[in-house]
Amino acid sequence: MSPQTETKTSAGFKAGVKDYRLTYYTPEYKTKDTDILAAFRVTPQPGVPPEEAGAAVAAESSTGTWTTVWTDGLTSLDRYKGRCYDIEPVAGEENQFIAYVAYPLDLFEEGSVTNLFTSIVGNVFGFKALRALRLEDLRIPPAYTKTFQGPPHGIQVERDKLNKYGRPLLGCTIKPKLGLSAKNYGRAVYECLRGGLDFTKDDENVNSQPFMRWRDRFLFVAEAIYKSQAETGEIKGHYLNATAGTCEEMLKRAQCARELGMPIVMHDYLTGGFTANTTLAHYCRDNGLLLHIHRAMHAVLDRQKNHGMHFRVLAKALRLSGGDHVHSGTVVGKLEGEREVTLGFVDLLRDDYIEKDRSRGVYFTQDWVSLPGVLPVASGGIHVWHMPALTEIFGDDSVLQFGGGTLGHPWGNAPGAVANRVALEACVQARNEGRDLAREGNEIIREAAKWSPELAAACEVWKEIKFEFETIDTL
């Protein structure tokens, strides 16, 4: 062997495989205000100590790999590595732990949810030493939050644009979700809006299909909005879904909505992707459009208790990426959502400062440093009998969206909208008078139905409809 290629054992570095916990498990570490903190629910393989499992998560989601490499000596691992700084057992679960990991801020590109998720929820979720892994929560430090624009407008600006105060906003998803022609679709929108709703909505899978191309839908919906505004004297909107196969096409659709004078567009942020979503959010702020966000595909990621990520993480990511509304579950309807857990991430969407509260699944205190808030949207299997509970649970800063609960009215769309508007106004008035919506809700609805035949008919149709199943994702 020539002298140039000969390797001396006394030189270089010590190769081989070493335990992650020797480098990445640091229980003595004091977290910094600039660290991004993560709480992982870790289920190790049998025989893998929890400290090793937590350290493996920290390593594989930051600077580590499966073996020692000589280029470790060319950087400062102490500066850049993730650290598992605490581990606690999960009550009531065997061999399951919460591992707390701190990441230095320099590991992440500024203003990029895409880069943040690529590291923290990347390859580590397929790591063989773990039976399952779930990201329960993230603490986004102010230093990183300030690199994001966030929601295009926020709650107060939206209320000012719409001139609507003191109550939740009312919406409706047009059904059937697929198959209507553009003209019939516009007719359905008009009937709902003239009946008293604030918004109607494209379903998440309405894009530009053969039965209804996007431009035709936009034109007929615009006609419906202008006609209903003229008749009611109220500002109306329809969530025009701009989601498309490319970012360029998405922006073209948003531009068309703006040119038609529409107040709001919509995006499917998980199927569309965070890069596309942030791009659209920036366009909406620059051009005065509100942005409604649908969370299609979220349950693929967040519904299983042991693997994936909790929706509160996706909600925080959305607030960073940008959106003025996001679907958040209903607690009382057909879609998954435990009350305290749902209220936990609803606060994370709306409020500026949220204290740690493990009873609601909030693992870290979160300071949004004045990043605009997001309106939670309650949608899915709700009807007039749910109105008192929804008003009490979500409060004024929310959107209550009744699809079948409007369009399923026996007298048609407009009477269905009237029934929902009357029920909402009755609940808000009763609450403002000091009545207990949780206890007196049914009585309040019955009283209002005495002078609203539309509400009385709705009450009769949906008096037996309930969705009572055990919640899968619990604390």
From Swiss-Prot:
Keywords: Acetylation, Calvin cycle, Carbon dioxide fixation, Chloroplast, Disulfide bond, Lyase, Magnesium, Metal-binding, Methylation, Monooxygenase, Oxidoreductase, Photorespiration, Photosynthesis, Plastid. The active site is at K175 (proton acceptor), H294 (proton acceptor). Belongs to the RuBisCO large chain family. Type I subfamily. PROSITE patterns: RUBISCO_LARGE (PS00157). Binds 1 Mg(2+) ion per subunit. Heterohexadecamer of 8 large chains and 8 small chains; disulfide-linked. The disulfide link is formed within the large subunit homodimers. The disulfide bond which can form in the large chain dimeric partners within the hexadecamer appears to be associated with oxidative stress and protein turnover. It is found in: Plastid, Chloroplast. The record marks K334 as: Transition state stabilizer. Its cofactor is Mg(2+). Its EC number is 4.1.1.39. GO terms for biological process: photorespiration; reductive pentose-phosphate cycle. One of its GO terms (cellular component) is chloroplast. Its main location: plastid. RuBisCO catalyzes two reactions: the carboxylation of D-ribulose 1,5-bisphosphate, the primary event in carbon dioxide fixation, as well as the oxidative fragmentation of the pentose substrate in the photorespiration process. Both reactions occur simultaneously and in competition at the same active site. The modification N6-carboxylysine is found at K201. The modification N-acetylproline is found at P3. This is Ribulose bisphosphate carboxylase large chain. Residues 1-2 form a propeptide. The modification N6,N6,N6-trimethyllysine is found at K14. The basic functional RuBisCO is composed of a large chain homodimer in a 'head-to-tail' conformation. In form I RuBisCO this homodimer is arranged in a barrel-like tetramer with the small subunits forming a tetrameric 'cap' on each end of the 'barrel'. Mg(2+) binds at K201, D203, E204.
